[in-house]
Amino acid sequence: MYLKYFVYVSSVNNLSDARYCSGMFVDYIGFNFDQNSKNKISIDNFKEIKNWINGPKIVAEFGDSSITYIEEFMSKIEVDYLSINYSSEIIKKIDKNCIVNISDKNIMRQNPKFIEENKNKIKLVTIDDFDDSMIDFVKYEGIDIFIESKKSFLDTEKKLKKYDLGLKLSGSNELRPGYKDYNNISDILNEISIPT
């Protein structure tokens, strides 16, 4: 089995999501380390979960965290990429290839050249609320774009095909340890899976 599109699953904070996504051959799994988030994962929990994952690239998601906080965490964990929100100050201080998350298109319009000016440091861009007007500001050679399925998946899939984009999904909390309702993630991953 494989998936029709490249898939990034964000905000994973439990073993159930991580193992399920790994078994479905998603490409990236992101873990929430944002210092401002109530749902951030502990380093110990992350390390325990990471030991069970094989295949996907591992992303540490820092959102709007300070550079001091990011550097402290990056010295304690091993990941393939780190993700930050659209922020020109932080990216200048990061020496690792990173992922940029655009959570609000209005922020992007305030600094439309951000991706272009930092394209040598950016591996991919994730967009929470994509519309067609954004494509010219984010599409550069060597940078993959992943968009979140906020409305109907049918509408999202049209954009995936039209612009050759990847799909961004989000993990959720377990109902209790080891017990998980996968609803949205499993429905979409099953929809885009191709049996081999």
Identify the meaning behind each predicted range.
Residues 96-97:
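Leucine-rich repeat
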Residues 1-93, 109-196:
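Conserved N-terminal beta1-alpha1 strand-loop-helix module at the mouth
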